[in-house]
């Protein structure tokens, strides 16, 4: 660390002294990893879903009902963690051991409860996600399966939109979207999020 005269050193804040000392030692506290930014695939899917939502309400003659859904980093992170066993194994279908399943459920239930608390209600977020055969807290074999290949049109997209719409309520303003590539195939995972906090 370069020499500082005593008067200058004493005027530094505590944080500045720590930072300066660390810089002199060649080290420093590691910053937490930044949340993953949405990919172009995910942004394109959000745009396509909003376009389908607009068409839906226009066809019903209720354009005033339309609300544009926004990308939610919280819900997207939940989706990413939810399907991580498949992504890590690079397999669309995985079978966990009972121990792995129990640990995974505990972690995801903690994440779920934290988001429900943050957004004001147990109705803010469901125990599952669209695009994955696995539901937290329900008896099942220890299996997880990605079910919806990525598409912006066609039957897969239409069915996904219908399922998303059925999950939505009047407080749904945001979507979590995660589009992993697993075993060479792109998939889509969607999490509707309802913000029920009192504003």
Regions found by a protein language model. Name each.
Residues 102-199:
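A well-ordered secondary-structure block
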Residues 33-115:
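Short, well-ordered surface patches within globular domains
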Residues 3-4, 37-40, 198-199:
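Short N-terminal secondary-structure initiator segments
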Residues 1-20:
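N-terminal secretory signal peptides and thylakoid transit peptides that target proteins
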Residues 30-35, 193-197:
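Protruding loop/beta-arch "assembly-hinge" segments enriched in small, turn-prone residues
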